[in-house]
Curated annotation (Swiss-Prot):
Keyword Transcription appears in the UniProt entry: no
Protein name as it appears in the record: GTP 3',8-cyclase
Enzyme Commission number(s): 4.1.99.22
Catalyzed reactions: GTP + AH2 + S-adenosyl-L-methionine = (8S)-3',8-cyclo-7,8-dihydroguanosine 5'-triphosphate + 5'-deoxyadenosine + L-methionine + A + H(+)
Pfam families on file: Fer4_12, Mob_synth_C, Radical_SAM
Cofactor: [4Fe-4S] cluster
Keyword annotations from UniProtKB, A to Z: 4Fe-4S, GTP-binding, Iron, Iron-sulfur, Lyase, Metal-binding, Molybdenum cofactor biosynthesis, Nucleotide-binding, S-adenosyl-L-methionine
Organism of origin: Cronobacter sakazakii (strain ATCC BAA-894) (Enterobacter sakazakii)
Gene3D superfamilies: Aldolase class I
Binding site for GTP: 17, 68, 99, 160, 262-264
Cofactor notes: Binds 2 [4Fe-4S] clusters. Binds 1 [4Fe-4S] cluster coordinated with 3 cysteines and an exchangeable S-adenosyl-L-methionine and 1 [4Fe-4S] cluster coordinated with 3 cysteines and the GTP-derived substrate.
Alphabetized GO MF terms: 4 iron, 4 sulfur cluster binding; cyclic pyranopterin monophosphate synthase activity; GTP 3',8'-cyclase activity; GTP binding; metal ion binding; S-adenosyl-L-methionine binding
SMART domains assigned: Elp3
Length: 329
């Protein structure tokens, strides 16, 4: 095995976020308010199953322990179960997760688990069915809730729920969310709204710091937990009276990037060193044949030397990220 992926700032990278499509059937206000429009797809289309197999093998050989399958909506891929199984072929990858809008969970989550999936994140921005419809453009609230129940029934001990925190939309609904997770092993993660190229007006209107939630949690006796090395950037809080947990993801917080441990590969095979970085390094020409593994690994290692110490969101620089479906958030 090659040496562990490490950048110029001694950060080690154990975590790959792999987008398998940028197509999504929801129209979330903060991501694709006008619905999906094909943009970044080349004539080759999205990564094939064999290309996914090769890129994940290269990352596994470079020390990756966790792969998250993202989109768009990854479950729109008809071969999604095969994708999970292909990633599972790497014994050093201990965690295989998916981030999903949840609309296919009730139908398919048991099959995903059987294929090798170890963790599920579901996007739910409101626990009010009408507001959920207004945010997502889809009247699927009950279907998504049934999907979360199905994930528990399939044997997942914990489900993570991602909630984009928005001023005057859901920031004042903390009590509703806390009641929901009191008797459920759900880690509810409030994610600060991030500015994207297409979403700057929305950002100015609805951004609110996660610190408002953190202050309220601490006031109510919630306890800040320590992070493990393959964890994401969430600050996680627990409470003895609650089965669930609260996570806060605050990209505008000081030193947010100091604990960065993930790299991203887009659905067309570009390596992105940062969600809000410029450009991307094309890996696709090295995904055609089995004999290209050494060259592929070398390109990944070389590219990592160019990773910057921090994003530049504070200066309003969102890089190439026009919307979050492009790289997979």
């Amino acid at each position: 095995m090659a040496s562990q992926l490490t950048d110029a700032f001694a950060r080690k990278f154990y975590y790959l976020r792999l987008s398998v499509t940028d197509v999504c059937n929801f129209r979330c206000t903060y991501c694709l308010p006008d619905g999906y429009k094909p943009a970044g797809v080349t004539n080759k289309g999205f990564l094939s199953l064999d290309e996914i197999r090769r890129v994940t093998r290269a990352f596994a050989n470079l020390g990756t322990e966790k792969v998250r399958l993202t989109g768009g909506e990854p479950s729109l891929r008809r071969d999604f179960c095969d994708i999970i199984a292909a990633v599972r072929e790497n014994p050093s990858i201990r965690q295989i997760a998916v981030t999903t809008n949840g609309y296919r969970l009730a139908r398919d989550v048991a099959q995903w688990r059987e294929a090798g999936l170890t963790a599920v994140n579901v996007s739910v921005d409101s626990l009010d069915a009408r507001q959920f419809h207004a945010i997502t453009g889809q009247d699927k609230f009950r279907q998504v809730m049934a999907g979360i129940d199905a994930a528990f029934d399939a044997g997942f001990e914990k489900v993570k729920v991602n909630t984009v925190l928005m001023r005057d939309v859901n920031h004042h609904q903390l009590d509703t969310f806390l009641n929901w997770i009191q008797s459920r092993p759900i880690q509810l993660r409030f994610i600060e709204l991030m500015e994207t190229g297409e979403g700057s007006d929305l950002f100015r209107k609805h951004h609110i710091s996660g610190a408002t939630i953190r202050d309220e949690l601490l006031k109510r006796g919630w306890i800040h937990q320590l992070r493990s090395r393959a964890d994401g950037p969430a600050q996680v809080f627990c409470h003895p009276d609650y089965q669930g947990e609260i996570g806060l993801i605050m990209p505008y917080e000081k030193d947010f990037c100091a604990s960065c441990n993930r790299l991203r590969v887009s659905s067309v095979g570009k390596l992105h060193l940062c969600l809000f970085g410029d450009g991307g390094v094309d890996l696709r020409d090295l995904l055609a044949e089995e004999g290209q593994q050494a060259a592929l690994m070398a390109r990944i290692e070389t590219a990592l030397l160019g990773k910057k110490q921090t994003h530049f969101l504070h200066q309003g620089n969102t890089g190439i990220t026009q919307n979050l479906s492009y790289i997979g958030g």
